[in-house]
């Protein structure tokens, strides 16, 4: 059951980034009702949550995950084992936010790989002690920081089952905690 958005006379306390994402999603849904859409206090609170999320993401924006190949590729047409280590779920969320609309993840790295390279990714979120595996394909490369986007690789997830896609969508919506992400390996 979803928690309703607190009434205007109740102070909102946010204890985690993902809780803020979940609250914003609920507020966006509620803002579509005629009563809330015209409520200036509600809209101001929604703006506060949006600002909190934006500031938080800006603080992690410059931090780069560790990305390394676990084997020397002989042929980039065959999947290459690789590992990406994020400090925590917020950094993973930020990487998904940059490319999940396109069905993948953006990994900030100075490493270059050919377009269409196949990857068997092992993803680790250090703070939460969560590890999972997912298949990916390099769909674009940004060799150096340009147009506000850091150097890195755009990786499209492939072979995702409907359940795995739902796990990622629910995580992005703040509905699932990071410890549910190992279901992606199934």
Tell me the role of every PLM-derived stretch.
Residues 1-100, 174-186:
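N-terminal helix initiation/capping motif
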Residues 124-129:
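Short, charged beta-turn/beta-strand-edge "cap" motif at the junction between a beta-strand
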Residues 93, 130-134, 151:
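Short beta-strand segments
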Residues 77-122, 152-154:
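Short strand-loop-strand
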Residues 133-142:
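Short beta-strand-centered aromatic/proline hotspots
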Residues 2, 145-186:
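C-terminal output/interaction extensions
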Residues 104, 144-145:
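Short beta-strands and strand-coil junctions in structured, solvent-facing domains, enriched
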